[in-house]
């Protein structure tokens, strides 16, 4: 009976018991197991139905998380394009704050809450991102990368109950390890 109850609302039950967000990993892959074209160039590998489902997920999850690689490759907005949908908090893992200030996640940070999470402090870039309306958290781990456990605790403390990871292979791999 407990499993059946938990299955009714996994986000709520996870958040209430762990005080960290429920995390879901969203990715698409080609028939040969790739996440992008052979050239390394990212491209749509799904159809309209799958893309509509992604926007439904973005509306339901409180935060969407990607890595700097996705920002550099795709320059995404990370918003919800579904009518009546809610834009999620954007969380960008960027260990060394390499995201260009011209990126769409930076240019739209005044209108859609955005948090950059770094592992190495860069006061100048922090100030530039903050001037654009973004928040910067420095949560470096012993390995020089973002500390996932600290990040999940921080998001939980901010009452972010769910995170949709849409990052590329590196973010997926590091999330899976934690």
Feature roles, as predicted:
Residues 177-178:
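Short glycine/threonine-rich loop-to-helix capping motif typified by GTGT followed
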Residues 11-31, 35-161, 170-173:
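Active-site ligand-binding patch in enzyme domains
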Residues 1-10:
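Active-site loop-to-helix "anion-binding N-cap" substructures in soluble metabolic enzymes
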Residues 165:
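Gly/Thr-rich phosphate-binding loop signature of adenosyl cofactor/nucleotide-binding cores
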């Amino acid at each position: 009976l407990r499993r059946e109850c938990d299955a009714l609302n996994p986000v709520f039950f996870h958040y209430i018991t762990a005080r960290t967000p429920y995390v879901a990993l969203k990715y698409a892959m080609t028939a040969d197991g790739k996440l992008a074209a052979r050239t390394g160039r990212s491209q749509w590998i799904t159809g309209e139905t799958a893309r509509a489902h992604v926007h439904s997920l973005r509306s339901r999850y409180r935060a969407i998380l990607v890595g700097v690689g996705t920002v550099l490759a795709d320059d995404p907005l990370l918003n919800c394009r579904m009518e009546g949908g809610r834009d999620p908090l954007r969380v960008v893992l960027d260990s060394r704050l390499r995201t260009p200030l011209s990126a769409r996640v930076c240019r739209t940070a005044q209108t859609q809450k955005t948090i950059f999470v770094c592992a190495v402090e860069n006061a100048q870039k922090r100030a530039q991102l903050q001037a654009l309306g973004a928040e910067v958290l420095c949560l470096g781990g012993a390995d020089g990368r973002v500390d996932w456990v600290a990040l999940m605790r921080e998001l939980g403390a901010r009452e972010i109950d769910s995170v949709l990871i849409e990052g590329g292979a590196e973010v997926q791999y590091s999330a899976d390890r934690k």
